[in-house]
Amino acid sequence: MAAYNKADLERRMKGAVESLKSDFSGLRTGRASTSLLDPVTVDVYGANMPLNQVATVSVPEPRMITVQVWDKSNVTPVDKAIRSAGLGLNPVVDGQMLRLPIPDLTEERRKELAKLVGQYSEKARIAVRNVRRDGNDQIKQDEKKNEISEDEKKRFENEVQKLTDKTIADIDALAVHKEKEILGK
């Protein structure tokens, strides 16, 4: 039985795309979204915890995020964590509720975010190419062990290349869409 596993390669390439989507969800586009605060961790109870484990995050208006902190003693650490997350948000504390007005993006900030989109998508492309290399290495090993013929080797390599091309096209489409969203085009 050959060790080349197309399903495993597909799963790993899909994982790179999902990771990219997750990275993109943290980029601010000028509209309020709860996913904007996903990367925020709060130092409470002697540990770093995700924000959604110490508060309820919601979007009551298109340009406002509210964070309802469950424990009053955590309001200050949550405020500090959001301010230091580098998201350009300044919470307004109102009891146990933090209101985060979403400011308009400056042209400079939009360009920075567009650059980040490029970096994130390149990281995903590299991950996909590494998966392709692993697949091709496995195919070559299978051929050396005489588990597959020369024709099968070529067919499998073509399968891997088609899968790679399709996945990279998906990544490029996601990047173009996110860039347009950020630049407001």
Swiss-Prot record:
Localization (cell): Cytoplasm
A family per Pfam: RRF
GO MF annotations, alphabetized: ribosomal large subunit binding
Gene Ontology terms: cellular component: cytosol
Any one GO biological process: cytoplasmic translational termination
Keywords from the UniProt entry: Cytoplasm, Protein biosynthesis
Superkingdom of origin organism: Bacteria
InterPro entries with a match to the protein in the record: Ribosome_recyc_fac, Ribosome_recyc_fac_dom, RRF_sf
Function: Responsible for the release of ribosomes from messenger RNA at the termination of protein biosynthesis. May increase the efficiency of translation by recycling ribosomes from one round of translation to another.
Record PANTHER family: MITOCHONDRIAL RIBOSOME RECYCLING FACTOR PSEUDO 1, RIBOSOME RECYCLING FACTOR
Similarity field: Belongs to the RRF family.
Protein name per the record: Ribosome-recycling factor
Organism: Zymomonas mobilis subsp. mobilis (strain ATCC 31821 / ZM4 / CP4)
